[in-house]
């Protein structure tokens, strides 16, 4: 049995959110970044036939460089991607709220 694209998006999203340095999933800058199936959608992950597009907001200060964070995300979602190439889009940086 194969997973539906919404299941793939959700599983990938959970793996991404469990990654140190990821604040949240992004929504897309100029077009909505989401996967649709039936009447449901999952925002932050776009499942295409040959590609998985992950949109994130990273934490600042950074625990690792952006390229290292993207590599770690690709490793974490590899099992969920169904062999698709994974593209990581860093949409924004969320600065930690520090008390003065």
What kind of feature is each model-predicted range?
Residues 2-3, 63:
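A generic secondary-structure micro-motif detector
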Residues 4-12:
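Alpha-helical assembly-interface signal, strongest on the long, hydrophobic N-terminal helix that forms
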Residues 12-26:
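Short acidic amphipathic segments
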Residues 63-84:
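Short, non-transmembrane amphipathic alpha-helical segments
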């Amino acid at each position: 049995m194969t997973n539906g694209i919404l299941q793939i998006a959700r599983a990938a999203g959970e793996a991404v959110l469990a990654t140190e340095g990821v604040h949240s999933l992004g929504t897309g800058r100029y077009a909505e970044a989401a996967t649709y199936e039936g009447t449901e959608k999952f925002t932050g992950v776009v499942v295409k036939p040959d590609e998985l597009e992950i949109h994130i907001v990273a934490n600042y200060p950074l625990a690792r460089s952006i390229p290292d964070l993207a590599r770690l995300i690709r490793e974490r979602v590899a099992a969920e991607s169904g062999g698709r190439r994974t593209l990581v889009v860093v949409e924004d940086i969320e600065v930690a709220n520090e008390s003065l």
